Amino acid sequence: MLIIETLPLLRQQIRRLRMEGKRVALVPTMGNLHDGHMKLVDEAKARADVVVVSIFVNPMQFDRPEDLARYPRTLQEDCEKLNKRKVDLVFAPSVKEIYPNGTETHTYVDVPGLSTMLEGASRPGHFRGVSTIVSKLFNLVQPDIACFGEKDFQQLALIRKMVADMGFDIEIVGVPIMRAKDGLALSSRNGYLTAEQRKIAPGLYKVLSSIADKLQAGERDLDEIIAIAGQELNEKGFRSDDIQIRDADTLLEISENSKRAVILVAAWLGDARLIDNKMVELA
């Protein structure tokens, strides 16, 4: 497994792979890897000849400096996990390598609408940072496919739109959420939970599933469903942050023409902001 930290060396390797006619898959990450990331790697390996995993804690997508400062950096452990998975190449650049003149004056990519709605409304600049770094990685790695987790549902929708709008010749693969046995979606942010909070955390998925059951049973008073869900979260020990029920294909509000709904939930548990989602077919 090659570990590359600079752009010239990365370009050199990508040119070699292209000359050899290899099919390349990219798995972009911020490190602190868990089994959910490994599922992305496995999906990439099944679809390509060569797998490139990027590990970069992107300062442009953090709306709070304290979140950036405390985000776990575990490069050595991450590389050991990826090596066991037989990943071909890890790209782990420094911030200086990606943003030599800082982020303030760096050219950015923005996806209108999707970047400022829902999660984007509560985290200004977050999705602009995501679309900028992902487009930069696409340009550098030139992958045939790229794998992203469905846990970050809005992010996946944003990347799909960016790829379509910008004409990237890349297949975007959404990989289903990986959960612990108790239902909690795997996330790097779960590491912020205390032992006691970890016992409470599966309640998020229980509330999410309760909303899904109501929708599948034909209930359509969305305001009431959301209000009850928020109350249930608070009673379980969470601080409900945002609950949305949207058209899964457009992320707009549910209409009579909507065929699928996505339930998007965000809640604080101690210092961890947990997100999860679930799709529901509408009768």
Curated annotation (Swiss-Prot):
Alphabetical keyword list: ATP-binding, Cytoplasm, Ligase, Nucleotide-binding, Pantothenate biosynthesis
Binding site for ATP: 30-37, 149-152, 186-189
Record-linked InterPro entries: Cyt_trans-like, Pantoate_ligase, Pantoate_ligase_C, Rossmann-like_a/b/a_fold
Residues the entry annotates as binding (R)-pantoate: 61, 155
Protein's pathway: Cofactor biosynthesis; (R)-pantothenate biosynthesis; (R)-pantothenate from (R)-pantoate and beta-alanine: step 1/1
UniProt cross-references to SUPFAM superfamilies, sorted A to Z: Nucleotidylyl transferase (SSF52374)
Key word Ion transport present: no
The protein's Enzyme Commission number: 6.3.2.1
Disulfide links within the chain: none
Superkingdom of origin organism: Bacteria
One Gene Ontology term of the molecular function aspect: ATP binding
Known catalytic reactions: (R)-pantoate + beta-alanine + ATP = (R)-pantothenate + AMP + diphosphate + H(+)
Pfam families per record: Pantoate_ligase
Any one of the GO BP annotations: pantothenate biosynthetic process
Annotated catalytic residues: 37 (proton donor)
Function: Catalyzes the condensation of pantoate with beta-alanine in an ATP-dependent reaction via a pantoyl-adenylate intermediate.
Additional free-text comment from the UniProt record: The reaction proceeds by a bi uni uni bi ping pong mechanism.
Assembly behavior: Homodimer.
Protein name per its UniProtKB record: Pantothenate synthetase
Native source species: Escherichia fergusonii (strain ATCC 35469 / DSM 13698 / CCUG 18766 / IAM 14443 / JCM 21226 / LMG 7866 / NBRC 102419 / NCTC 12128 / CDC 0568-73)
